[in-house]
Amino acid sequence: MNKTQAQGIGFAFFAVVLFSLSLPMTRWALEGFTPLFTATGRAVIAALLAMLLLKIVRERITPPDHRKEFIYTMLGAVFGWPILIALALLRTETAPVAVIASIMPLTTAIFAVLRGHENVSNQFWIASLIGTGILVFFTASRSSFDGNDLIADLLTVGAVLASSFCYVQGAELTRIYPGWKVISWVVIMALPITVPVTIWLWFQVEDRGAINTHATIGMLVLGISSMYLGFIPWYRGLKDAGTARGSQVQQLQVFMTLGWSVLILGESVPPLTLACSIGIVLAVTWAILSRQGRSKSLQVAK
């Protein structure tokens, strides 16, 4: 692993730290907002921040080219993952959704190979499968899966595929534009949809008095961190480390989330969690350090 790849892993790790706040902050946000409002509202917050930053540095607020690729990224990052996950959570509890979502690093690697034409070794796939298996075992062990629903499962699978695809497409765009511009243009392009939907959902809120401090902080952190700032180092990390390899760092996210849950929500960490954490760290390290084949990035026509 060369210096650029090591730097990419560092960026990806920092991004996952920011992404790991999503679940605790979503729990706070849901104290006062519906799942769908949380999904679209955070995109609006991210877009407002993006427009402010672009104005400060005097950059255009829409991409100069590659509109089709930006639309693909937007569909996954702004709509696919947040909305499909919200719809799934309306039908079932969190644990079954978490089990299916655990395969995201693996599906991202598959998309990177199929669409991004990256080459990885057999050791990488073995390490990735082991890490994914530990994640599925860990999340499955935390619930009895009461209320499981096939439609919810299919919605979650769709969310995972949408998110994995947008990760790969966004990483390819960062070979042309800086990562912060990519995510800025993505959330801004979604405004014609997210703004009216968010306004409509706001007027559907029956008890605005239930919007407490936790809900407000949760929404702001989701919009600023999970929907915007986290994607800047994430896309840079996937570009430098390689999408397949860099995405494996996300296997650590569930355990980082548990860490935040201890600090923010006062939850406890059982011994099984620590054991699975060690297994995941070893699997991720193996995947990252595995021999890398030559890669050919997706050629985007200008």
Regions flagged by a language model, labelled:
Residues 1-40, 87, 145-172, 193, ...:
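Glycine-/small-residue-enriched transmembrane alpha-helix faces in small-molecule transporters
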Residues 4-9, 31-36, 40, 62-68, ...:
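Juxtamembrane helix-entry segments on the extracytoplasmic side of multipass membrane proteins
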Residues 17-20, 24, 51, 75-79, ...:
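Hydrophobic/small/kink-forming positions within alpha-helical transmembrane segments
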Residues 18, 22-23, 51-101, 137, ...:
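Specific transmembrane alpha-helical segments of multi-pass solute transporters/efflux pumps
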Residues 37-48, 76-77, 85-119, 135, ...:
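Specific alpha-helical transmembrane segments that line the substrate/conduction pathway
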Residues 39-41, 82, 97-103, 169-192, ...:
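Helix-helix packing/entry segments at the starts of transmembrane helices
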Residues 50, 108-110, 114, 128, ...:
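Transmembrane alpha-helical segments that form core, pore/gating elements
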Residues 50, 120-142, 251, 260, ...:
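Hydrophobic transmembrane alpha-helices of multi-pass small-molecule transport proteins
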